[in-house]
Amino acid sequence: MCAALKRCAYRHKGKIMENTNIVTTEQQAPNTISASNAIFNVQALGQLTAFANLMADSQVTVPAHLAGKPADCMAIVMQAMQWGMNPYAVAQKTHLVNGVLGYEAQLVNAVIASSSAIHGRFHYRYGGDWERCTRTQEITRDKNGKNGKYTVTERVRGWTDEDEIGLFVQVGAILRGESEITWGEPLYLSGVVTRNSPLWVSNPKQQIAYLGVKYWARLYCPEVILGVYSPDEVEQR
């Protein structure tokens, strides 16, 4: 084969390889298509459905409220896809409260912190003497179960409502395109009514910081956690 034909064949082969790569990329639609558009893409929807079915078959790596429920797993898959996270990791951070799916505060905090809505990390200002809310105590309670009454030991707070007065956290972050920190309003511990997590007893500063981040995000970047609620918020609804 003459040199000219060889060059022509090489260029033609390069185009075929290039086209093949394009097709391969298009076949990986779920990796590049947005979650909101996935339901309108037949190929992407089929792959997501197959993954949701596989996820629902799991008995160990997904919580009991998702096992055997492909439709619910599909919602988790699409939410994880929107956040760019592992669906199994997201599933482990969910809870069923009053028939509504709730996401753990830790997950919601991570989603907001890793989003493109803010630059860098969140900043926190604590006010008041938080040393007043570091004491805990153990109590025993009688509960009724299927096999009758039984006694449980619980750790509860060792401080009073008066000790919480004046304690607050203020959350702030640098919004995308800005250079200064945008601070939210102070969130007072005495104003937090629903406290489902035991961490409100052992680590109230962390829990109120999580709550402050959610309040800040709902005000300044609501699109990041639209339709996502923590168990504490679900119980209030």
Predicted regions located by residue number:
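Short, Lys/Arg-enriched N-terminal segments with co-localized hydrophobic residues
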Residues: 1-16
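Polyanion-binding surfaces on beta-sheet-dominated domains and ring/shell assemblies
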Residues: 13-237
